[in-house]
Each structure stands twice: as structure tokens, then as C-alpha cells.
């Protein structure tokens, strides 16, 4: 079992923890999160980027993690970036808690997400269905108010 954790912070009041667990190289990865202080009653884009570089805030982390050269999509789509995790949904206080299992996001192997960045966006991810070029790259999810590097956990 490999475990990883990401602590989310940024230029805003948003904070959170994202946990990752993978049993073996062939198992799906479980991703669970608890995020606080985002916009109330909203859907907000949730992605993994290729770099663990946050020297210039969340923008220096790069585009969505896409080692297979696919277009942007939802976490449940066959054709999507490895780093596409869809949207988190916040409650009336701006908090979100949830989990998903994913077969593309890996902690083990050449495309491991350890050392990469989780980004929470300021807008809703259109899941690649926005009808323009930017939708196929970013889902038009907007600015990046919070992010954190994924590190190995005990």
C-alpha cells in the first residue's frame, strides 16, 4: 500500500487535505478530500498538474497532468487527462468532503502523481464540453486560488 497526502493552501482563504491510497500498481487509487472556505454551493475544478513547483503560486505548477496526450474531460471519461478529477461540490458553508476511485491516477509507476500538484480552481470545470479550444485544455475552470504538492505519506 502506497499513501500520499497534499495540503492545499494559496492566495485565498481556501484550505484542505487530499489523501491518496493505492494498493498495488494494478489497483485503482482512492482519492479523498476535505476542503474548507471555498465559494458556497458551488462546483469547482479539481486537477493534478505535472510539476511540484509552486514558486510563483499555483500557476507555476503547469497545465493539467497529461502524459498520454489526451484532451480534457471528466474523471469518469475514457478520453481525459490523467490529472482531470472533475469538480468538487461545496455546501452552504463552502466546504467539500468526498472521495473517488480512479484507475488512471497512480502513486506507483512511471506516471506517479507523487511530487506533482493538486489545484483547486475558482470556477466550474466544464469537463471538456464547453465547445472551444480552452475547454479541451482546461475545462475553462479559471484561476487557481489554492494548491499543494503531493507527498509520500506514512
Curated annotation (Swiss-Prot):
Which SUPFAM superfamilies has this protein been placed in? Cu,Zn superoxide dismutase-like (SSF49329)
Q: Where does Cu cation bind?
A: 47, 64, 121
Annotated substrate binding lies at 144
Compartments annotated for it: namely: Cytoplasm
- On whether Disulfide bond is a keyword of this UniProt record, the answer is yes
| Enzyme type, top EC level | oxidoreductase
Q: Name one GO cellular component term.
A: cytoplasm
Q: Which Pfam families does the record cross-reference, listed alphabetically?
A: Sod_Cu (PF00080)
Query: Family, per the entry?
Result: Belongs to the Cu-Zn superoxide dismutase family.
Its recorded name reads: Superoxide dismutase [Cu-Zn]
Where does this protein come from, organism-wise? Pleurocordyceps sinensis (Polycephalomyces sinensis)
Gene name, Swiss-Prot/TrEMBL: SOD1
Amino acid at each position: 500500500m502506497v499513501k500520499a497526502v497534499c495540503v492545499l493552501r494559496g492566495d485565498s482563504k481556501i484550505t484542505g487535505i487530499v489523501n491518496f491510497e493505492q494498493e498495488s500498481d494494478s489497483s485503482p487509487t482512492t482519492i479523498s478530500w476535505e476542503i474548507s472556505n471555498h465559494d458556497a454551493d458551488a462546483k469547482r475544478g479539481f486537477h493534478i498538474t505535472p510539476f511540484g513547483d509552486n514558486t510563483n503560486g499555483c500557476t507555476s505548477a503547469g497545465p493539467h497532468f497529461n502524459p498520454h496526450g489526451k484532451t480534457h474531460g471528466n474523471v469518469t471519461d475514457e478520453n481525459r487527462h490523467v490529472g482531470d478529477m472533475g469538480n468538487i461540490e461545496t455546501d452552504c458553508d463552502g466546504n467539500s468532503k468526498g472521495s473517488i476511485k480512479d484507475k488512471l491516477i497512480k502513486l506507483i509507476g512511471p506516471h506517479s502523481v507523487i511530487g506533482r500538484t493538486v489545484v483547486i480552481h475558482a470556477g466550474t470545470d466544464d469537463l471538456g464540453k464547453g465547445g472551444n479550444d480552452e475547454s479541451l485544455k482546461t475545462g475553462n475552470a479559471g484561476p487557481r486560488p489554492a494548491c499543494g504538492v503531493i507527498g509520500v505519506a506514512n
